[in-house]
Design a protein with these regions (language model features):
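Transmembrane helices of ABC transporter permease
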Residues: 10, 14-27, 38, 59-62, ...
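Helix-loop-helix
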Residues: 48-51, 147-161, 231-305, 309-310
Length: 579
């Protein structure tokens, strides 16, 4: 938690001035009852209008000064809180970018979004309130008691009894409700999670006619949240009647003692009014202090969750520069797996077991297997999205761990299973990996990806707007644009992770033909469920339950690998010839 305080270092001045100006405001507030007492004791008693007007002028000055101090304190506290949350959000976002896929999988996308948004907002609100009240409220409570003793020591003894009773009620309710607020926050997170899940998967929900089930699930979670919030609200509502009962009893006692003191000449009627005002000030500040503690407790809980993400250490260490030279005997290697195994964090069994193969520069490597066989897991090791649990992955003759992040990702480009585009234009999406690419290079990449025709048909061409997630494009268009984006930078290794699933066979075949015609020694890994897409590959890797059960050409595997033959036969009738 101390690390998070470091983000306040640029706002030290505001963090000091905000509570100081609040204390100044409180100081002027403490003088108001005394001025009121003077008006009653002197001005009204003597029917001195001039005295009353002068004292009213003093009250007005105190109010203006107090308001100025309050607004100034609010400005400084808001500036510090907003600046702090902005710095914290930037740091958290930057830290998330440094995490590997393993940490991202463990934390979860919805959790990280919650930390970035509602948790940091709660920390900001708590800090803003803390800077304004953590000195003011105790100062007013103590100051009001001291001022009461300056008015009349005997009557002020009532404060000595009333303040502990008020404190017991206020802080007792706070202690009881504090853990309930935490439970309510957990249930609120659950409701938000269900909402996010439903909106993300709305097409699947409707495809399976599960709208009513989702409504019922949401209502159950929402009912639990509502019941908890009502329970907390009922307990919190006890604070007002109980505190006002104590205050009213204390005021009655003050009036009783005051009347006796007035009769014996020990105090004036205006002094009683001052004591009642001080009692009300104490009540207000105790309630504020209790609310402050509740809000700060929530903020600290949220800060702890943010800190937990910041404390998550990246599982991968990328060197600043290349660590090794390429041995002469590996100069022609593009990718080499040497007895590689992979077990995901928290998984009970390995996703890949003892995988070994070598892909030469310029080769096309097919990867095929059933659902859950480990195809994506295998290709994700090449750009080092994950580190192998056992064995070594070598890229262009060097261990993948010897490459700086930028160098490795510059040599290996990936077209993901799920096509992801970002809000902007077609041009801005294509320039993601290679900002300096020319229009000619962009159009060449679009031609290769079989996307040039539909981009040319757009009114603005490369400058056609793309909505967030590519919502204004079809699935096939998105896949072709992500493919074009991948080879704009002319990588050494290109991975197509089932990236043609939304394309028809003719477009898929044209894309593979265009890839084969690219100049240079581009090594291509094609992950596909279609045997026809891979039959012309130089090598085909056949995976089954995380193991490499076949390695060879299409014809070789049909003779030697039952798993491949089964996949092939399930897609084509016997005797069909694929060309």
């Amino acid at each position: 938690m101390n690390n998070m305080l470091g983000y306040l270092r640029n706002y030290k001045r505001e963090s000091v001035l905000a509570p100081l100006f609040k204390m100044l405001e409180a100081t002027f507030d403490l003088f108001v009852p005394l001025v009121m007492a003077d008006i009653v004791n002197v001005g009204i008693a003597a029917h001195d209008l001039h005295y009353i007007l002068v004292r009213c002028g003093i009250l007005l000055v105190l109010a203006v000064i107090g308001l100025t101090c309050s607004l100034t304190a609010q400005y400084f506290s808001a500036k510090a809180a907003v600046g702090y949350s902005t710095s914290l959000r930037h740091a958290l976002f930057a830290h998330i970018q440094s995490l590997s896929f393993s940490e991202m999988d463990t934390l979860g996308t919805s959790t990280l979004i919650t930390r970035m948004t509602s948790d940091i907002n709660q920390v900001q609100s708590g800090l803003n309130l803390f800077l304004r009240l953590f000195l003011r409220s105790p100062f007013v409570v103590i100051g009001a008691m001291v001022m009461a003793f300056t008015v009349n020591a005997r009557a002020a003894l009532i404060f000595v009894v009333a303040i502990p009773l008020l404190s017991v009620v206020v802080f007792g309710v706070m202690v009881i409700t504090r853990p309930l607020y935490k439970t309510a926050q957990v249930r609120l997170d659950r409701v938000l999670g269900l909402t996010r899940e439903n909106l993300t998967g709305v097409r699947v929900v409707r495809a399976f006619d599960k709208e009513q089930d989702e409504i019922d699930r949401f209502e159950n979670a929402n009912d639990l949240l509502t019941k908890m919030q009502l329970h907390v609200g009922h307990l919190s509502a006890l604070m007002s009647p109980l505190t006002y009962v104590i205050i009213n009893i204390a005021i009655v006692a003050l009036l009783y003692v005051g009347s006796i003191e007035i009769n014996v000449g020990g105090m004036a009627s205006g002094d009683v009014i001052a004591l009642v005002n001080y009692m009300n000030q104490i009540l207000i500040e105790l309630v504020k202090l209790a609310n402050l503690i509740v809000q700060v407790s929530k903020a600290l809980a949220c800060a702890g969750r943010v800190q937990a993400v910041l404390d998550t250490k990246p599982g991968m260490d990328f060197p600043a520069e290349l660590r090794s030279e390429v041995p002469a005997d590996k100069a022609g290697d593009a990718v080499r797996f040497d007895h590689v195994s992979l077990t995901y964090a928290g998984a009970g069994a390995p996703s890949l077991s003892d995988i070994s193969f070598t892909a030469k520069r310029g080769q096309t490597i097919g990867v095929i297997g059933g659902t859950g066989s480990g195809k994506s897991s295998l290709v994700n090791l090449i750009p080092r999205f994950y580190d192998a649990t056992e064995g070594t992955v070598e890229i262009l003759g060097r261990p993948a761990a010897d490459y700086p992040r930028e160098a490795l990702r510059g040599k290996v480009n990936v077209v993901m299973q799920k096509a992801q585009l970002f809000g902007g234009t077609i041009r801005s999406n294509l320039l993601w990996g290679t900002p300096q690419a020319t229009d000619a290079e962009l159009w060449a990449a679009l031609e290769t990806a079989q996307a040039a025709e539909f981009v040319q048909a757009k009114p603005l061409g490369l400058d056609e707007p793309v909505e967030q997630g590519g919502r204004n494009l079809s699935g096939g268009q998105k896949q072709r644009l992500t493919s074009a984006r991948a080879w704009v930078g002319k990588p050494d290794i290109l991975i197509l992770d089932d990236s043609a699933s939304a394309l028809d066979y003719a477009t898929d075949a044209a894309l593979r033909k265009a890839l084969a015609a690219l100049p240079g020694s581009l090594t291509v890994f094609i992950v596909s469920q279609r045997a026809a897409s891979l039959q012309h590959a130089d090598q085909i890797l056949v995976l089954d339950d995380g193991r490499l059960v076949g390695l060879g050409t299409h014809d070789q595997l049909r003779q030697s690998c039952p798993v491949y033959e089964e996949i092939y036969e399930s897609q084509f009738k016997k005797g069909d010839v694929q060309k």
